Amino acid sequence: MSFSVLAVVGPTASGKSDLGISIAKAIGNAEIINADAMQLYKGMDIGTAKLGEESRQGIPHHLIDIVAPDQELTAVEYSKLAHDAIRQVLERGNTPILVGGSMFYVAAALDELDFAPTDEVVRERLESESEELGALALHERLKSLDSESAERIPAQNIRRVIRALEVIELTGEKHKSALPEPNYLRPTLQLGIEVDREVLKNRIRQRVEKMWAVGLLEEVQRFLELGVNFSRTAAVAIGYAQARSQLLGELSQQEAIDQTVSLTNRYARRQMSWFRRDTRIRWLDSEANLEKQALEQIRLGR
């Protein structure tokens, strides 16, 4: 299969960003498009492991720092931006490389998706109910209506719980059924990074501890001083709520770090569960040379 779009996916802390840059440098004339939902937000740098300009090694990056943390950017809006970015890279004669682990955003960028309907009145009512009854009550409601979605969506991610309930109410169908069988919008080669679970746990612990060491608290403190009210999407960024709780004296530093590690491990498991269902992905072994494996798959794909 000849492809026009490359993608590098996998769980958090698996090395996607570095591999994306290595591939871009090796094949030449390539540009990276971000598919990490939290790296879209300006100023959310340390907690999202966002690469700085120097670390990007001169490779053009798109869809990073495009919206303020107090603004909402839906998956539908991201889809349009990603499709435009991919088209523009191709028009320049370059290869777009989508890099990220935000599952639905990857699908929104690569696949033909018929997005489920939305209704502002229904959504606002569900949001009011979540404030009145609590996130757990809405998650229990979702479990009674669509147990598979409830298993995939954690109760603390109230934005996705509300979205699933909204789709069910508007369509009468389970949220999962709103996603069709995957079909690439353009010919795509999707590479996934497979990491041993214990190795990944260690990497996640090291990454989180480094975030605290290099200034996550100061980053969150600046947001607090500016009075920034995080949007629903930005508010679910793992690490930011924990750092805020530490600054407010609600958690010790060790408790904040441990909670962030635990939530990140849980998120990584959900990522792998999602990506493993996509039989189109060609998996790379993180214990071997990732760049060499990726370039071999690219050679075969061409």
Regions found by a protein language model. Name each.
Residues 1-302:
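Phosphate/pyrophosphate-binding catalytic cores of soluble transferases and nucleic-acid-acting enzymes
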